[in-house]
Amino acid sequence: MAGTRGMIALAALAVLAPVAAAGADEPQPAQEQEQAEPLQVTVVLAHPDDELFMAPALAALARQGARVQIAYATQGDVGPGVSGLAPGKALGEVRLKEAFCAAEALGAASVASLNRGDGTLGVNAHHEGSSARKLLADLGLWLAETDMILTWGPDGGYGHADHRMVSAIVTQIAEARPAAERPKLLYVGIPAGSLPPVQEMADWAVTDPALLTENIAYTPADLEAAKAAAMCHVTQFDEASRKGMMGLFDATMWRGKVHFRPAF
């Protein structure tokens, strides 16, 4: 959510690592091996901290047994937030650590950084060698086996160009797949009339509730996981905002479930 600051590789892969792999190599009982494969959920976002916009839903999916993997198109290396750090590689490394912290809190299985340049996805997107073209190639391979994709809607939340481009690129990949192979693609949204009463979110996009036909309900424990994830993003939000953000979202735009609309 780069931009809401006072509130509240394949060679291209710079990072692709499990969040919690304890016991992963231990032999499993035969009956467990025979169980159906877990739901593969891929969350594609622009920057570390974007996951907060749907955080309790991710915790709920992981708790229910889904394998949740989070892919960030960039490391957020030009968004210092409240940190005072200079834009650049060092900031990106810190923000990626924050992303791992948040993913662990939410129970995600893995985090990937595609590292395609914060703030560059909309620059000459149709040109050969552009960040957008490279991201399209990255994700085309990376999304091949997923069952469900969660991402920004066309509005990008509050219109951030990187958010919009991530949504568009993911949609382009999904719409080209035959129906039998197409993953379920869901855009996260804010129901009209439910924006938090804070100035920093006054211009965020809202969606007609009639279109938000998919919802992921969460428990108090999932919300606590989301609160823990928010506390990871020290560079982006002051302490009061980190402590209060998830509770505010829960009381206004979520109310026990995160809202999505199907792309198709």
Question: Where in this protein do the model-derived segments appear?
Answer:
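Sec/Tat signal peptide C-region and signal peptidase I cleavage site
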Residues: A20-G23
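Bacterial N-terminal signal peptides that target proteins for export
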Residues: M1-I8
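Metal-dependent de-N-acetylase/amidase catalytic core
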Residues: A9, D25-V44, G129-F264
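Active-site rim/loop-helix segments in enzyme catalytic domains that contact anionic ligands
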Residues: D25-A144, Q172-A176, A180
